Swiss-Prot record:
Alphabetical list of PANTHER family matching this protein: THIONIN-2.1-RELATED (PTHR33920:SF2)
Chief location: secreted
The keyword Secreted is assigned to this record: yes
Annotated compartments: Secreted
Secretion signal span: 1-28
Segments forming a coiled coil: none
GO molecular function list: toxin activity
UniProt KW keywords: Disulfide bond, Plant defense, Secreted, Signal, Toxin
One of the record's GO cellular component terms: extracellular region
Annotated gene: THI1.5
Propeptide: 75-137
The family this protein is said to belong to: Belongs to the plant thionin (TC 1.C.44) family. 4 C-C subfamily.
Name of this chain's protein: Leaf-specific thionin
């Protein structure tokens, strides 16, 4: 019976992650050459300027992908608010909301395996599909 519960838990985890993946939308981002350009762009947008106008005025580019070109490295205003931190918080949030709920259902060897699978699924989700092996594996 414990095997059925663990299988159900994994299926529920996969379904929830599938629903979340369906809701992810790609939005355009701005990349600037330096912090001055980033500050200029943010001030322009705050004042009500459109993305293309502010990007042109401040020497920035509007991109549709997740990565800025090498010559336009400034994606965020603060250096500590970069993509690695966002990925880390995404993974922590996913594990907390999805995997911890599974952990509360049942304990045992199967559940430990399921938790590893759930953690890996969260890591893949937050890293755009990159495979990251679990520490417990």
């Amino acid at each position: 019976m414990a095997t059925n519960k663990s299988i159900k838990s994994v299926v529920i985890c996969v379904l929830i992650l599938g629903l979340v993946l369906e809701q992810v939308q790609v939005e355009a981002k701005s990349c600037c050459k330096n912090t001055t350009g980033r500050n200029c762009y943010n001030a322009c947008r705050f004042a009500g300027g459109s993305r293309p106008v502010c990007a042109t005025a401040c020497g920035c580019k509007i991109i549709s992908g997740p990565t800025c070109p090498r010559d336009y490295p400034k994606l965020n205003l603060l250096p500590e608010s970069g993509e690695p931190n966002a990925t880390e918080y995404c993974t922590i949030g996913c594990r907390t909301s999805v995997c911890d709920n599974m952990d509360n259902v049942s304990r045992g060897q199967e559940m430990k395996f399921d938790m590893g699978l759930c953690s890996n699924a969260c890591a893949r989700f937050c890293n755009d599909g990159e495979v990251i092996q679990s520490v417990e594996a």
